[in-house]
Amino acid sequence: MYAPECIYWVPATPEGGDPRREVAISFDDRRRLEDRIYRLRTGYAWSQAPKSRTVRMISNVEVFATERTSIRMVRSNFLISEFRVDGTRLLSGWCGHRFVQSADRWQIQVRQVNLIDCDQNLRNPSIVL
C-alpha cells in the first residue's frame, strides 16, 4: 500500500507548514510506520492496552490528475470514532494523498492527515490515523 519511500504526516497546526521545521503530531517514514504496526500487532504498544475499537468514515473523495500520468493527488474527509475504556472520542479532518504508480499498482507516497483540532489537547493519539 505504501511506497518504499513514503511520508506519513499529521501537522500540529491548521496551516500545515513544513514538517522538517515545525512541530508535528506525527512525521514518519516507512520504517517508522512499520515499527508502529509491529508494536500494535505484538502488544508492545502500551498506549493501546486494551486496544481501541474504531470506526472510520471517509467521504468527499476527490482525485486530481497531475502533469505526470504516474502521479495522482487525492483529497478526502474523514471521521474516526474511537472507543477506549475511558470513553469515546471523535477525530475528524481531511487527508491529502499523493499516489504514485509503481509497476502494476498505485502506492501511497505521501499521506497528510489534517485534524480540525490539531492545535488542541488531543490526549495522545495512539492509533494510526
Model-derived features with residue positions:
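Short beta-strand segments enriched in hydrophobic/aromatic residues
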Residues: Y2, F78-I80, Q112-L115
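A solvent-exposed, acidic/Ser-Thr-rich amphipathic alpha-helical stretch
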Residues: A3-V74
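Generic structural "secondary-structure junction" signal
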Residues: V10, D29, L115-D117, L129
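Flexible, surface-exposed loop regions and adjacent strand-edge segments
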Residues: G16, I127-L129
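A short local loop/turn or secondary-structure capping micro-motif enriched for an aromatic residue
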Residues: G17-D18, E82-R84, I116-D119
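Short beta-strand edge/turn micro-motifs at domain boundaries
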Residues: M73, S92-N124
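Beta-strand elements of well-folded, non-transmembrane domains
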Residues: F78-R84, R98-Q101
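Short, solvent-exposed loop/turn segments at secondary-structure boundaries
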Residues: D86-T88
